Amino acid sequence: MINAGSSICGAAANWCISAPGTAILSTIVSGDIQGRLEKTADYVRLLIDSQNPTYDYGLKTGTSMAAPHITGALGLLMERFPYLDNAQVRDVLLTTARDLGAAGVDPIYGWGMVDLRRAIEGYGSLRVDTNVVMNQRAGGLKVWEGDAWDDWTNDIGGPGTLTKSGIGWLRLSGDNSFNGAVLREGTLELNGSNTLTSAVDVQGGRFLLNGSLVSTTLTTTGGVSTVSASGVLKDGNLTVNGGVVSFNGMQTGGTTTVGSNGLLKGIGTLGSTRVDGTIAPGNSIGTLTINGDYVQGATGVYAAELAPGGHSDQLHVTGTATLGGTLVALPEPGIYYLGEQFNFIRADGGINGQFAKTDFSAFSPFLQFSLAYGTNGTRIDVARGASLASAATTPNQRAVAAAADLLAINQGLPRPLTQLFPQQVGGVLDGLSGELHAATPLALVEGSRYVRDAVLSRRAGAVAPGADAGDATGAWVQALGGNSRLDGNSNTARTEANSNGLLAGIDHEFSGWQVGVLAGTGRTDVKQQALRAKSKIDNTHFGAYASHNWGGLGLRGGVAWSKHKVKSTRDVDFAGFRDSLSARYNAHTRQALIEAGYRFGGPEAGLEPYLQVARVEVDLKQINERGGAAALHGKVDDTGTTIATAGLRFDKGLKASFQQDSWLHLRGGVGYRRASGDRSQLADLAFANSTTTFAVEGAPIADSAVVAELGLSAWLTPRQQLELGYSGQYGSESRDHSANMRWSVRF
């Protein structure tokens, strides 16, 4: 209840508000006090002798009764709006008051009766320009998961302009009519119907329009603005001078202008539009509608996203589209098919002009994009672009690329290959090359020495101390393991081979000759790690050998034949393509060798210079890989390599001073090896369903290498011998290490 005794605003009406002040129940203090005054030259004071207070309640009227209501309300609102300053909280209280007396602010009741229920929902009016710094979480009844967020649901009017600062989020859910808004940072969201008397100016932060702006211009110079599907810009213009605007709603009765620093995108409907900045229909792939005419100026950019399958951003113009400026095409994930078409402009009233520039640099140069202008539309056509061979840097890559360039588009490989960029092509072509097949025969040539070394280590006349020289028949078994590496070069990949095996032989001496035969099995694993390619080779060996000594002069020789069952696998994996390939085929190795040496020394120690020549020939059968589009078929040329070695061997008996003969011998040697003939090999291959062949080279063997050997031999009994040995060769392009253990017996 209010009367003239509890609310008289007078000249302070603009800062005055009414509150209940009539017949307010209040505490009453009464009673009597006994005291006296004491006066001196320096002071006057009241001395209390006794007091008898009484306390009661009663109804009181006046401004003193009304003031505590206002003070309490202000305290509550300061807690509710911790991000507002004192004057702003006061204005919230004033502008949400319930009008009393004469309409508007009057000298009796001021703004009217305080209304806390309305006040906690935010301003009722912006009486002055107001800068809201949202940097604290709202208090009171507003609960939200964010740090600084609030929702003002009142209908806000007034002559003031709202400036939104701070990182927080302010939502206005009412139907507002104040004097425009400025967004500097954080988020400002308009959900109701807003008929503002000045523009909404987005300078930074994020602006959201889920309601409507009526007869109000939306101008952006920065930040990100989003007009949702329910957002409406009615009888108002949109000016994008900077920042990003995603327009997904409806513009009616206004026009749109995009300045040189602005970006407009979305899937909504706009009025007539002029673009001197950038327009990018869709929010990924989508259509933006211009209900009117469209003009793209000389500085304008149309950024169109193209997705595989012929899907693209599109601009639908109900009037006339006048083109100029630049078209920039942007890719989406996937594979683009040659022959695809992308319709990105449709103008019901016709097309005028053309783009001055086009930019397809975001796509592979192996695709060619061209524009086709029609009466009412514009499209992009996709065709084959630069050749893959133009990006190849090695002979192998150029050979593969030339064959791939000739493949028909429906053969599987051209589609993913044409999506690549030049810096990716080299590695992909290496993986497609099938170089493993060209490297395999060279790995077999390198591994052939294990059989030769076993043959040459059987020498006529090797008799244990105390043994009967008539023991003319011998048998032996040898286990071996080795690792070889062909380093490759700028054109070929590094190739490694790990071998193991078991050889056995029997020989007989007659008339100074030792003649024998051997057989064995083994396994060789060839790997090109960089190319994700490998072969597993099962080996079967047969051979014959003979040797003769004429005093210090020794002559040794032999022949061997090996059959190899090759199981190869390759994995080809690059962007948009994956294939696992395998093949099974046979190969054969034939070799013949002869060695002559002259030994100086006696039974306990000696030196032997020697000269050795070997001829190794390898042939591979037809290769037919199983797999997808990257499968290869073809043949590797026959390989013929001559290997000549000159060196010096030594042996030394190891015996104690009390022993007459040595049962333990140290042996070793060093030599120089030269390879001639086929040091590298070519494979003539073709892709699946293609007859166009290409030649790829495998990693070469070294033309020269240093060879070394070291071992121990021990006579376990007069008829049994155990030998342990190491041999290796070291070339500029290859390395080879092997170890063996052999047990032999004479009988």
Say what each PLM segment does.
Residues 83, 95-153, 157, 312, ...:
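Outer-membrane translocation/initiation segment of Type V secreted surface proteins
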Residues 1-75:
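Extracellular S/T/G-rich loop segment that most often corresponds to the catalytic His/Ser-adjacent loop
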Residues 80-91:
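Short, charged, surface-exposed loops that flank catalytic or proteolytic processing sites
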Residues 410-606, 723-747:
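Outer membrane beta-barrel translocator domains of Type V secretion systems
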Residues 215, 230-237, 251, 255-343, ...:
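Extracellular beta-strand/loop-rich repeat segments of large surface/secreted proteins
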Residues 44-53, 185, 491-510, 631-639:
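Short secondary-structure subsegments characteristic of cysteine-rich extracellular domains
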Residues 590, 614, 626, 630-747:
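Outer membrane beta-barrel transmembrane domains
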